[in-house]
Amino acid sequence: MKLYAISDLHLRHNDNRLALQALPAHPEDWLIVAGDVGETLAEMELMLSTLTQRFRQVIWVPGNHELWTLPSEQPQLKGEARYQRLVSLCRSYGALTPEDPYPRWPGPGPERVIVPMFLGYDYTFRPDHVPADKALEWAWEDDLLCTDEVLLHPEPHASRAAWCAARVEATRARLDALPPGCATVLVNHYPLRYEHVRLPRIPRFSIWCGTKQTEDWHTRYRAEVVVSGHLHMPATLWRDGVRFEEVSLGYPAQWKYRGVHAWESCLRVILPGPTP
């Protein structure tokens, strides 16, 4: 029995949809889908209807793309209302979400809890010399503007940063309530640490990539593995003896060079895993 993970499926691309349909079944295994499935409820439902039939259990966390409110999609759900609609859709297929009790890993090895999280970002992944109120201006200097600024609405929160603060506070309370000594697999769409945002071509895009409030969560909450996506740069990194897995598939041009069975090779094995 294995725990796999993948993220950034971006199913609005036809090649990605075809690859999804070609993915072999893993009837004994679990799968983490770490956000950015697509932009529409139909794309989300395509993922759920496909992967819940091929894996014993699917665990989903939202990326930014799922939370977009597109002018063409009805109903026009925004912010928390859209997120809750996605949660309801997952539950209708038996997939777990950040709003459900954290599942215990039933596979071999010591006791572990899988922690799907929805945290968002608060523009703090930036150099210390950049003031908070200048973060967007700092990105604009490099001609960068994330589509979230137009399509990702924070209602009923005052801002995306305020929504992030509320999610961090609520998630921290749940993590603090875990049994002492219980190991975790932490799952979030965004990296938990600023140092892991490796974007050499667009370094100032980092402000839309997480929050510094989670910098020590891998040790504070006894993580064996931290799973994230968003960067479209698959990698295995180590920090403080903890394995960090960036599990993005990405856009067709980013994964096609991996060959015909790209999706199969992009499924990252989370458990059991290597040692440092």
Please give the residue ranges for each predicted region.
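Active-site neighborhood of phospho(di)ester-bond hydrolases with catalytic His/Asp-centered motifs
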Residues: A5-S7, L31-D36, I59-N64, L96-P101, ...
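Active-site-proximal loop/helix segment associated with metal-binding centers of metalloenzymes
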Residues: V113-V185, Y190-R201
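Beta-strand-turn-beta hairpins that frame and shape the catalytic cleft
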Residues: M1-Y4, Y102-P116, W238-R243
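Metal-dependent catalytic neighborhoods of phosphoester/phosphodiester hydrolases
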Residues: D15-A19, E39-Q53, H65-Y93, P106-G109, ...
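Short amphipathic alpha-helices and their capping/turn segments at secondary-structure boundaries
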Residues: L46-T52, T97-P98, P103-G109, A132-D133, ...
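Binuclear metal-dependent phosphoesterase catalytic core
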Residues: Y93, R198-L199, R204-I207, T211-E224, ...
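Short, solvent-exposed loop/turn segments at secondary-structure junctions
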Residues: H10-L11, G38, H65-L67, R104, ...
